Amino acid sequence: MLFSMESILSSTKPKLEPPPKLEPEVTINEQVVDLPRSNTRLSEPSTSASVLEHDLKFGESRKRSRSLGDEPTEDEDGVPVRKANKRNHSTSSAADSSSDDAKDDDDDDDSTSRKSMSGHRKSSHAKPPYSYIALIAMSILNSPEKKLTLSEICEFIINKFEYYKEKFPAWQNSIRHNLSLNDCFVKVARGPGNPGKGNYWALDPNCEDMFDNGSFLRRRKRYKKNSDTYHEMMSHHPMPFPPFLPQGMPFPPRMMHPMANIPMLGHPMNPRAVPNMPAFFIPQNIDSQKLLSMMASRIMPMDAPVSSGQKRTSSSSSPNENGSSAVSDKLSA
């Protein structure tokens, strides 16, 4: 049996197996790396399509809720909207209420401005050529009892003149002021059997001829209370002379005769004060207000009070005087 060297060598040499190929592992790694890239590339159109579908569905649901009057529960970002809508509704209602209040205030201002402008707007009737004093006197003289209240005077003027009817009540305060400031009008109190609101007003008996021959267009003279009323008051005064007489005031006739000495109940408060009555002399027509001011200015001041320093000096000097007098008494003894 023949053996060749090649067969012997081949039998003695170990058979070498080829190393395992790593290509499948590399392909697996490539697939692992490439799969997310392919997924992300494919997921982008899918996500955009899903977002579009979500927007379309949200828009349709929102339109349906608006048509049905319901409010959406979520916003575009998925945030609940119901509370925000409630807050917006409350703020809108508060704004509406404030606007309503502002409208009401505007209406009130308009009404007050209309009332205030009623006295300034032009009237279709001409203004009567009478003063307020003439109107008041006219109404009082045309009344049966010759006395009227403020409301009755205004009622007479309104019924008599259309001009004042349109301007009422803008001129009512003028009537009130003329009644209280003019001496020709006298206030008459209501009797016990005549209850009601407000006093009566009448003309002073001395000013009935204030207007010429019953014409109220012009007053003949301006009525003013005379100062003779003061002399009449003094003539009926219980005391023979008033407590204070101003300088320039004449003696009443009753002071010309001598008066009896009035007994005093106690010592005078200021015995050093000697009454120094100046020479009295006169204006005939003197106003009552001026008279009162003159009487107040002529009150004689009292003696000035002694200061504390003088009191101290007098008190300190008194013991010295007593001591000196005691010494002189001893020496004389």
From Swiss-Prot:
One of its GO terms (molecular function) is DNA-binding transcription factor activity, RNA polymerase II-specific. It comes from the Eukaryota. Keywords: DNA-binding, Nucleus, Transcription, Transcription regulation. It holds the Pfam family Forkhead. It is found in: Nucleus. One of its GO terms (cellular component) is nucleus. InterPro entries: Fork_head_dom, FOX_domain-containing, TF_fork_head_CS_2, WH-like_DNA-bd_sf, WH_DNA-bd_sf. Disruption phenotype: RNAi-mediated knockdown resulted in de-repression of unc-129 expression in ventral body wall muscle (BWM). One of its GO terms (biological process) is negative regulation of transcription by RNA polymerase II. Residues 127-221 bind DNA. Expressed in ventral body wall muscle. Expressed in the structural cells and two neurons of each ray in the male tail. Changing R218C: In oy10 and ev582; Ectopic expression of odr-7 in an additional pair of cells which adopt an AWA-like sensory neuron fate. Ectopic expression of unc-129 at equal levels in dorsal and ventral body-wall muscle (BWM). SMART domains: FH (SM00339). Residues 14-24, 52-62 have a biased composition (Basic and acidic residues). The keyword RNA-binding does not apply. Residues 1-126, 304-333 are annotated as: Disordered. Residues 307-333 have a biased composition (Low complexity). Disulfide bonds: none annotated. Residues 37-50 have a biased composition (Polar residues). Residues 98-110 have a biased composition (Acidic residues). Probable transcription factor. Binds to DNA sequence motif 5'-CTGTTTCA-3'. Required for the migration of distal tip cells (DTC) and axonal growth-cones along the dorsal-ventral axis of the body wall, acting by cell autonomous repression of unc-129/TGF-beta expression in ventral body muscle during embyogenesis. Binds to the promoter region of the unc-129 gene. Plays a role in dorsal-ventral patterning and fate specification of the postembryonic mesoderm. Involved in male tail morphogenesis and in embryogenesis. This is Forkhead box protein unc-130. The lineage of its organism: Eukaryota, Metazoa, Ecdysozoa, Nematoda, Chromadorea. The gene is unc-130.
